[in-house]
Amino acid sequence: CKPNLMQCNTSFVILDPKGEILRDTGKLLESKGYEVRVLDLISMEKSHCYNPFVYLQNDNDVQKLVTNLFKSTTPKGSQAQDPFWDTSASMLLLALVFYLHYEAPEDEQNFAMIMEMLRAGAIEDEEDTRPSPLDELFAELEMSNPDHIALKYYRSYHSGAAKTLKSIQITLAARLEKFNL
């Protein structure tokens, strides 16, 4: 791999789990005019970012993003005891992603904002019937655009009892826990 890199004759995407290739050839590539980017999922502070929201063009792309995220966060060989929780968490995530995709400014279309929205919808007390800030956000959307696709998913998610909604939120938060880093 290194001899090919040192020829500096094309663009490269390199798998370098130990960081050895970067250490040995990174400075050379930069001196030859290459822009070296690192995606490090272990040390996120040393990593360039990837925002899949940038690539969302249509509703089908949003569906694929959520489906792929759930597939990639399911441990290999595991079987859901009750698919209700994952399906419901997926509906909530679809509501949030669709909302951001169609309603938020570009700089807010990211998973950090998804986590903020999820926290804004947190159900602290199951006896408290007041709407959460997230409920209010979707209520405003309903007033301006009652047929919005995000609302369709939010209504499906929000049709359960408070205890059920809290469990769905926890299921989704567990799936997205890496986005808290």
Model-derived regions, located:
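P-loop NTPase motor domains
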Residues: 1-181
